[in-house]
Amino acid sequence: MPVITLPDGSQRHYDHPVSPMDVALDIGPGLAKATIAGRVNGELVDASDLIENDATLAIITAKDEEGLEIIRHSCAHLLGHAIKQLWPHTKMAIGPVVDNGFYYDVDLDRTLTQEDVEALEKRMHELAEKNYDVIKKKVSWHDARETFVKRGETYKVAILDENIAHDDKPGLYHHEEYVDMCRGPHVPNMRFCHHFKLMKTAGAYWRGDSNNKMLQRIYGTAWADKKALNAYLQRLEEAAKRDHRKIGKQLDLYHMQEEAPGMVFWHNDGWTIFRELEVFVRSKLKEYQYQEVKGPFMMGRVLWEKTGHWDNYKDAMFTTSSENREYCIKPMNCPGHVQIFNQGLKSYRDLPLRMAEFGSCHRNEPSGALHGLMRVRGFTQDDAHIFCTEEQIRDEVNACIRMVYDMYSTFGFEKIVVKLSTRPDKRIGSDEMWDRAEADLAVALEENNIPFEYQLGEGAFYGPKIEFTLYDCLDRAWQCGTVQLDFSLPSRLSASYVGEDNERKVPVMIHRAILGSMERFIGILTEEFAGFFPTWLAPVQVVVMNITDSQSEYVNELTQKLQNAGIRVKADLRNEKIGFKIREHTLRRVPYMLVCGDKEVEAGKVAVRTRRGKDLGSLDVNDVIEKLQQEIRSRSLQQLEE
């Protein structure tokens, strides 16, 4: 009979099989009331599943990450329950958990309107408030199939026929009269599923195949309590205000159009931000001793066949042909950098060789996945490749890590999650080589006092990697930086150097990206700063305004002086009220507005206002210029007097 070992090491002995709920009740009624599921010997199970042998058990509640995921999954079933009550002929497809919520794909003979979604959410609340028990039954494959055939659930029957073995025992979850099929676990009672909201609908092909029927996908979010739900909805509201597509249009930064899907038309102000970002990256390349190179954006298919990209990546590559030769527009820069490395004989004394490029890359992303600057087809990578010996890996990775944190801190990103991906089952190279490579990456992180987690088996076949994911002000994750070891590509492309022993050796290649796609990073910054770019990045840093025509000459002189000082400045001499001008440039997020009236002209000063509405008073022109230059030069995130 089972001996149950709890997380604190204590044990409970039973003379009969028990469920996680039984054990929770044994511990106390409070825990039993909070119990959502159990983790038995490391595996999630339903609260009602019986434990027959000795086992470790952790009780899962809404405070656990797994508990929240189970709540979300059960809310998908709740959605199914509600939609079948409102529209009984609906056929249910799949309803998985996604980030922050869930969705369900349904086959319905009507297009859901906003009113329909509201009615559906209302019915879900009515059902959840009944606090009914969710009953799980393990049945044979044949019984499960018969159940769904009788109910006309053709998609569930297809899942059974195509994805579930005949000797398996599927779990059927009964929500009163509604039955769904799932591996589980699910909540034992609907009292856990009160805090949700349906968000939107979209089209989705069955099994993601455009040859199949288009279904309707209903998205929802669910949380453990009302406070968490409201906080999430507030974050979404704030995110909508910060949407880089909306701000990009408002500030006239860029546009996209149907004739070039996923390609950016940069306007003057947006391109100014892009170039300033390039200047910043170049300054860091110089500081960390990189060469900057430029490779062709298109190379022959033969080269991509050698690298292995053609076999594994051709669907994402744009191709063209000329004079009976096929060419590929590059999706990445690395093969071109190896070609540059291969020019001329290299010695161990030439290593490490650090090569960087603002590479113009193109990938044939599905049109439905394109999203403003965040997901494009044409983009600029800020990546670099370091050619080094095995002995130099640790020092080079160390320098890459320092560079990553150095650059991210400039933009105020402080929360960075780091993951180390280790060897997959299918890989090249010896175990000894992988042992050393993984150890080098881990030690480099440890030497920089950076906490990290392992992603076992998630490395590429050609080497382990470090991933850097930064979190923005809304706590959204953006995976940008990568340090990837590569033991394959240099060999495939015949890269070599002469070692100390006078023998030819293959260099290790380190792929290093920090911002990733420049376009995407500008999108991230636009949302992070809500368009209030720090002064050094702002397209227009200062606007000088007159109150009446009598100050026009002074405004022009001051504008020229600011330009000569290297400040991006515009003069606004329009015959408009000063309040109108200030409001307009505030909406354009211009960091500083310098107002010139008769008093300022007479005193040789200028009245300074910030875009946040702060009046800094009347200041000496030279002092203002000096302070602005210092703010810009230091790439400060703070404005004057903040």
Curated annotation (Swiss-Prot):
Any one Gene Ontology MF annotation carried by this entry is: ATP binding
Q: What class of enzyme is it?
A: ligase
Q: Which PROSITE patterns match?
A: AA_TRNA_LIGASE_II, TGS
Q: Where in the cell is it found?
A: Cytoplasm
Q: Which Pfam families match?
A: HGTP_anticodon, TGS, tRNA-synt_2b, tRNA_SAD
Record keyword Cytoplasm present: yes
Give GO BP annotations, semicolon-separated: threonyl-tRNA aminoacylation
Q: Which Gene Ontology cellular component terms are annotated?
A: cytosol
Catalytic activity reported: tRNA(Thr) + L-threonine + ATP = L-threonyl-tRNA(Thr) + AMP + diphosphate + H(+)
Q: Where is this region: Catalytic?
A: 243-534
Principal place of residence: cytoplasm
- Please report the stretch or stretches of sequence annotated as the TGS domain: 1-61
Q: Which SMART domains does the entry link to?
A: tRNA_SAD (SM00863)
Q: How is the cofactor bound?
A: Binds 1 zinc ion per subunit.
Question: Which co-factor is required?
Answer: Zn(2+)
Under the heading PANTHER family, the entry gives: THREONINE--TRNA LIGASE, CHLOROPLASTIC_MITOCHONDRIAL 2, THREONINE-TRNA LIGASE
Q: What does the record give as the function of this protein? A: Catalyzes the attachment of threonine to tRNA(Thr) in a two-step reaction: L-threonine is first activated by ATP to form Thr-AMP and then transferred to the acceptor end of tRNA(Thr). Also edits incorrectly charged L-seryl-tRNA(Thr).
| Protein name (Swiss-Prot/TrEMBL) | Threonine--tRNA ligase
Q: Which organism is it from?
A: Salmonella gallinarum (strain 287/91 / NCTC 13346)
